[in-house]
Amino acid sequence: MKIILAVFVSLMLTAAAFGQSAPVWIDSTHSFAIEPGAKISVAVDSDAWGAAIVAMWNKAHPNHQGAVTYIHADATGATDKISQLQDSFADVVLAIDSEVSRNAQSLLALDPHLVWLGQHVTQPPFFENANPAGSYVYIPLAYNGMVFAYNKTMLEKLGYSVRTDDVNLPREFNTWEKIFALAKKWKNDRPFYRGKHVNIVFPMSLTEVWSAYPSLTADGWEIYGDGNPLDPGFEKASFRGGLDFIKEASKADLWVLANGRRIPGSSMTGLNNWDDWLNNQTAPFSLVGTWQDVKGAMEKGHYKLGFAAMPTWQGNRLTPFVGTKGFVVNGFTHYPSAAEELYRLLYTREAMETMIKTSSYLPALRKNSPISVSYGNDWVKEEMAKAFQYSYPEPAYFLPNNQYRKAMDVYYNIPMGQIYSDVWDGKKTPAEGQAEAVTLAKKWLADNNK
């Protein structure tokens, strides 16, 4: 009750700050009132999805047909556009979670009925981490990240079983110990697949540190796991354990060149290699992203993938980063009640199933959510959505003395990729790599937290 009251007070203060009346909830219809003559727009990054949203509104509100239009706009930088363009931009906008807090002053606080939806339908870390303290302006809608994938066709043609365990991993390869053993077995006996030697078992990323993150979690480490924006946790033994994992992957020859030599760490660049894997079937295992045309690649290459949680290492399951995309309401809208009514519709089962059919996105629903969706015949999205439940939400903290700097910037701005590469190449021990990360992070945080 205290939370709902606090949200209501926040909503009233926000509406007053923007010089608006607050959205009006109608108990009898479980919907928001629509202001007379309201004209609002929604910004999404898919024309098919935008048109479907307009059609959904017209169906739900036949007396207000034509009140909603859509514009095509990328989610990246969308909240910045609200701050810059104000009421010249869309009323309801698709945004990236990590960009919400920095423009919270330009966003309309959500009505308590919508906040309840966010608290019960989406996964708690995604909802709480993306919203600024004391205000709710964003509800996650769709995953934005990568999941583990395996080439079923390749594995079967090479004589391996793809019978799965309870997280949809092949039982023969549901641990990294088993995958490293496969890499060692192939050292002197490279298999042929579609006329080529298979030189890669898993195209691990090192220099592109966003997609390199899962390797660092092999000993249970989580960046900012203690919730302190000034302590990413590089000094922990579990972080060094992640560097040990990279060293063991190198010793196993997880990835070699055509001449049989281990690939240098500087060439393990991540995203381009994921595309190569998807389009050219270069290895049995990889990561795939929500932005990739997975179904198109399978159809073109005549093969089938499986998607799952990542394998374990010494009993610890590796966890990739995952973010979310969702909607925000432009604080400068002239029709806040109509905007929040559209917002409500966007988080219904019908709207989520429409999103599945007309965009590349997967709903970011918590287990046992009151909303459940059907993926129809889209087994790819269904498997990927289940795999995302094992991912780690990328922290969205800001530095306490510099609200223009995200705490995660330390990870992206110091040369972590070089450290990982040096450990892979044997130029540094895991302990030396850890010591360098601790020193660099302390200096960066001291320089930027002011």
Predicted regions: what they are:
Residues 74-82, 197-198, 220-300, 310, ...:
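Extracytoplasmic ligand-binding clamshell segments of periplasmic binding protein
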Residues 308, 357-418, 422:
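Long, aromatic- and glycine/proline-rich binding clefts that accommodate carbohydrate-like moieties
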Residues 25-33, 45-65, 149, 153, ...:
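Short, polar/charged alpha-helical segment
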Residues 21-31, 94-147, 156, 177-180, ...:
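Hinge/lid segment of periplasmic solute-binding proteins
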Residues 65, 134, 298-367, 401, ...:
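Extracytoplasmic/periplasmic substrate-recognition and gating elements
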Residues 20-40, 187-193, 450:
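Immediate post-signal peptide segment of exported/extracytoplasmic ligand-binding proteins
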Residues 41, 56-125, 135-138, 156-165, ...:
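Extracytoplasmic "Venus flytrap"/periplasmic binding protein-like
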Residues 19, 131-208, 222-260, 331-337, ...:
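Helix-loop-helix "hinge/cap" segment bordering the ligand-binding cleft or interdomain interface
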